């Protein structure tokens, strides 16, 4: 029979059409079958898939297909995280509506996903910008409001004073509005919040349940939640400031209380605003703070600035006066907006005190068993030690002092122990257009009420014109006008943070077509929690934390009965590619696509020379960097599919690096993956006639030769390794390497007897089955070519034959004085005496021990015999 040619484009289109016709990956609940829900983070429909998507979704698809072959009822859905600011920007640039741009992108990217052979149940597809999705989000928000978990308060935003609009952080460039160029101001406006802090302790303690999450992600969430044990302390003012007589601070170091020499408050603290009325320099300082947005992460590195309020607080234990300062490192949104300052034992406070000439007092010294320098003229002493200069608390260590000082404060009515969290409530208001409208109504009396459920969804108009200045729904007064109980009302014109949509999409997939409810609890509880979640570590905190929070809210609404949404998490690494640029006289870099650059490499594959194809002139090599539009070094997946086929991309992305590490996109590696696929194809085609499925004999385990046993052992060791690598360890690269190694063994396999053919057939079928999750198109065809009537998608994962792993014989290395002198084959159960006798009988061994005394014999069972002689 003429050899069948490997034509990836033809094969892949044929197989994909068959999957679609047969609805191969459609999932239904089957109570008698163990389920497996595999989910990859859904993409933002930006226009085209990038290689980061391809890697993410290939991992998810490999896991899904593996679990399906292992008898699980697998759900693997896909959808679109479709709201967000980029659509507004693209709509402006392309003079179109965000909705139209988004839906066009979804159509294109969906075809790309199909062309890569991902086994999704497309009947469960969701797009978060469609009203049948966000209506339930709106409904759920109103339920949270009714439960007291939603509230409205003023919060600071970036305000463009020229365009009179709120800007996202990404729209502020060097402190100016991206469109107007005006200096951005900080402005307080009312916004909606959800009380995630009510769940802070549960979100923290339930991290212990997530044993199959990367430790790094759990640590990041733990730090973000930021549980601390401390003391709330009340400082009275020496004189009332308007109607303010005292204020509270929170500290985790009450042991340093006697070292307080000043207190610092935020620029927006009521005390600061009161004092500024009579102190122009303070008013000016507050104004400068107001127009400088400070992220919490920047506090440690920013320049510390402050201004004296002229007010004094009374130390709660000593009765001494301490100055009240306004400081730019105190944020009103965190804690009470006031901190006690201990410059002797806090480096930030020390730097501030040095700058403004404030007193520095030592109240902690190193313990006797920890000799350390404690020179407060050079830096604060920040370690926990033993108290000094602290009245009756002198000599106490940290925990004793903590408890004793807290008890005294409590007895005086000046403080109490408190557990605090760094986590802040979730502000869900966005002053953008392309998002789900927040389902609240503002009444004439100033009250806010939820939109009645029978009036949901509050629909976002899609046929709009963007002007880049103001949201179309804010610009249209008629859209906001409505009634509530016969009285005039105005709709909320803010939209939800897009993290709202991505916080519960995993659950909607369970009953995506349900028009009558957010979730069907029966379906949701069958599929949830997600067994395997795949996505980038950049989502470790916000998305994954909000999603965990949402799951608990869904549970408390009776919609799901589990505590956590995702059992196992895999965070894939970034995809890197070579980058190339030229720098002009001003230092500005122009980046060129790798496809437009010719390179010369040394013997180690390092680029030594790069020239632009267009003009033949040199360009600089910027190294391997994350594929990005800014560096112009993205590789279009479609180009690789057209060149090599989807299976080649899939094999390369699985083989080139461990999944959690960065993957370097190297053309030679892609070519290598393609050669491997062709080798599998050719080996199978070369042996199809000899391995006819109808006439091939069965393996007779009792009549196998040594070579046949060796080959079967290699096959079943590979099955065991690949099963473990894919299922438990998720080291897909080593799984592919093991299949490659087995393939090398098969190239030399004999096929002269029926048993040779039977063993070889088992081996080749095993290769096809093991490779199927990774290169499913080719394996689908080869499975049929091997004579199988059923599709490989219904074939079980190959089982390990434990008897094949048993070795009848062992190869023993024989050394004399640590140097290899011979190799011998012995029975697997041979004793040390038998091995030693056979080893010493070898001619090459004898010549190195003749005339010498054997001092010692070292035997490592089944592996090595070392004879020590002199």
Swiss-Prot record:
It comes from the Bacteria. Its main location: cytoplasm. One of its GO terms (molecular function) is aminoacyl-tRNA deacylase activity. It holds the Pfam family Anticodon_1. Its EC number is 6.1.1.4. ATP binds at residue 629. GO terms for biological process: leucyl-tRNA aminoacylation. A motif ('HIGH' region) lies at residues 43-53. PANTHER family: LEUCINE--TRNA LIGASE, MITOCHONDRIAL, LEUCYL-TRNA SYNTHETASE. Belongs to the class-I aminoacyl-tRNA synthetase family. This is Leucine--tRNA ligase.
